[in-house]
Amino acid sequence: MALRPDLAIIAAAVPAGTRVLDVGCGDGELMVALGDKGVDARGLEIDAANVTTAIARGQSVVQGDANRDLADYPDDAFDYAILSQTLQTTERPDRVVDELLRIAPRAFVSFPNFAHWRVRLALLWNGRMPVTRLLPVAWYETPNIHHVTVSDFRDLIHARGIRVERVWHLSGDKPTSDAAASWRAEHAIFLIARG
């Protein structure tokens, strides 16, 4: 089975032989791909069913909450931290990003871009929160509590003195222009590092 587009990019970008913590690792799909290339991947996942599935796949995963349990990891415990499609579900995204870069010098952060043109059009035209391929549930059922945009995330990391090493913008599974990312990218993947 093919990896989700953001996970495929992250899997390709993580160097072999590194230590990785996948925060919000889901069923361990990315960890399996990383393990196949010689990465020592560990996972933190809030959903018990996903933890069980990941462990059944042979992955090292603990049940925990990114909002509270990242503090239990020592400084520089990993080479990379990964937070894929999870930032928008955290209580304090700013604190979670700080914790990622405390436990690893670099982090991959991917998220749906709530400023994508379809989202903007749905709000303008219908006056309602949209339901899209990347945001597939109604506003009252969504786990998303912080609707982040590419520009918002750039502002956050700039304010915290965090370096951007690389950015990928995707519309569907295809790259989109960085110049038009604010409104054309359905989701973004940032590789960030301590300042």
Q: Where does each model-flagged region fall?
A:
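Conserved alpha-helix/loop element of class I SAM-dependent methyltransferases that forms part
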Residues: 1-17
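Alpha-helix C-terminal capping/helix-to-coil transition sites in glycosyltransferase folds
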Residues: 16, 76-77, 103
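Class I SAM-dependent methyltransferase "Motif I" SAM/SAH-binding loop
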Residues: 24-26
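Class I SAM-dependent methyltransferase SAM/SAH-binding core
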Residues: 29-69
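Short conserved loop adjoining the S-adenosyl-L-methionine
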Residues: 69-75
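A short SAM/SAH-binding and catalytic strip from SAM-dependent methyltransferases
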Residues: 80-92
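S-adenosyl-L-methionine-dependent methyltransferase catalytic module, highlighting the catalytic core
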Residues: 95-99, 106-195
